């Protein structure tokens, strides 16, 4: 099937919300996302509007890329954030280089293994490189082997940075990085 790979538009917040809620109900969601379905469901529409606008086409600090089926249905998404040197990231670590940070990766189960995730990642990486990122990173749960295998196949390597999970004592996430080609 042919999909349109594109940046989300600011007015598509309801579709972005629906796909995120679907992602948070996936069986691997506890390993893939810090946010729970219940937390996301309780957020007001204004949250989803702002979140979508901040990652929409034309935004400088973030970009959400979607895969849209011919019938208009969204079947996958990925967001990349730009982190500037001299700032602190979400986990409290200093950001030393301009970098992209991939978050919110989701492809519907029936599309997994089809190559769609590769295409979404290519678009996200292209955007990050075009916005001056020196490297792109992502954080993956230590027990999420499937995701780790995909990220390695995409060229990402473990950096050695381990992030303890505050919500799950005794569990950690691992940073994977891809240097700019």
For each predicted feature, which ranges?
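A short beta-loop-alpha structural element at the N-terminal edge
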Residues: 4-18, 30
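Acetyl-CoA-dependent GNAT
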Residues: 18, 22-110, 121-123, 127, ...
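Residue-level preference for beta-strand/loop junctions
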Residues: 59, 98-99, 132, 170-172
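Conserved glycine-rich acetyl-CoA-binding loop
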Residues: 104, 108-122, 130-131, 142-149, ...
């Amino acid at each position: 099937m042919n999909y349109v790979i594109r940046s989300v538009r600011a007015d598509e917040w309801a579709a972005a919300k629906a796909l995120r809620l679907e992602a948070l109900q996936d069986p691997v969601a506890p390993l893939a996302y810090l946010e729970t379905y219940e937390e996301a469901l309780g957020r007001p529409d204004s949250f989803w509007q702002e979140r979508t606008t901040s990652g929409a086409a034309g935004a400088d600090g973030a970009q959400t890329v979607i895969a849209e089926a011919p019938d208009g249905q969204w079947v996958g998404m990925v967001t990349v954030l730009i982190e500037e040197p001299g700032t602190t990231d979400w986990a409290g670590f200093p950001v030393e280089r301009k970098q992209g940070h991939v978050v919110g990766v989701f492809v519907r189960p029936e599309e997994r293994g089809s190559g769609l995730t590769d295409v979404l990642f290519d678009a996200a990486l292209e955007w990050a490189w075009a916005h001056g990122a020196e490297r792109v990173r992502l954080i993956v749960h230590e027990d999420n082997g499937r995701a780790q295998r995909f990220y390695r196949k995409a060229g990402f390597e473990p950096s050695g940075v381990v992030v303890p999970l505050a919500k799950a004592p005794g569990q950690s996430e691992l940073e994977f990085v891809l240097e700019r080609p």
